[in-house]
Amino acid sequence: EPQRPAPGHPPPAGAVCLTGAQKPAACRCSRQDPKNRVNCGFPGITSDQCFTSGCCFDSQVPGVPWCFKPLPAQESEECVMEVSARKNCGYPGISPEDCARRNCCFSDTIPEVPWCFFPMSVEDCHY
């Protein structure tokens, strides 16, 4: 008979292997401008199928993909936003440390936009 873990103890690592991506955080979906959505599904996909593949689902806006790639993850949920929504919190060449001292977000992956920018409240984020 296979050995079972004692009650109250988790099974050994690797005993259960779940595949599939995780549902993205709400801000990564709701802050995406509908006109910038990149399709992530197929016609007739359900919200469950979409979320299972790590994508966002919103059927409220006609004429754009309902299952779409989320905005890039950031260190903090309040730093997730469209690049166009960034409000400058620093100066050209600011270091991540100086930006953090200002309690602002830092991302230097896109040129020609503020790299140090004010966070946004997560109150408005939803699926």
UniProtKB/Swiss-Prot annotation:
All copies of domain P-type, residue ranges: 27-71, 77-120
Annotated positions of the Pyrrolidone carboxylic acid modification: 22
Under the heading Pfam families, the entry gives: Trefoil
The answer to whether UniProt assigns keyword Membrane to this entry is no
A GO molecular function annotation here is: CXCR4 chemokine receptor binding
- Any one Gene Ontology cellular component term annotated for this protein: extracellular space
- Intrachain S-S bonds: 27-125, 29-56, 40-55, 50-67, 79-105, 89-104, 99-116
Keyword list, A-Z = Disulfide bond, Growth factor, Pyrrolidone carboxylic acid, Repeat, Secreted, Signal
The UniProt entry, under InterPro entries, shows: P_trefoil_chordata, P_trefoil_CS, P_trefoil_dom, P_trefoil_dom_sf
Q: Where in the cell is it found?
A: Secreted
Chief subcellular location equals secreted
Keyword Membrane set for record = no
According to its UniProt entry, the protein's GO biological process terms are: chemokine-mediated signaling pathway; maintenance of gastrointestinal epithelium; negative regulation of gastric acid secretion
Organs and tissues of expression: Found in pancreas.
Signal peptide span per the entry?
1-21
Q: What does this protein do?
A: Inhibits gastrointestinal motility and gastric acid secretion. Could function as a structural component of gastric mucus, possibly by stabilizing glycoproteins in the mucus gel through interactions with carbohydrate side chains.
Name of the protein: Trefoil factor 2
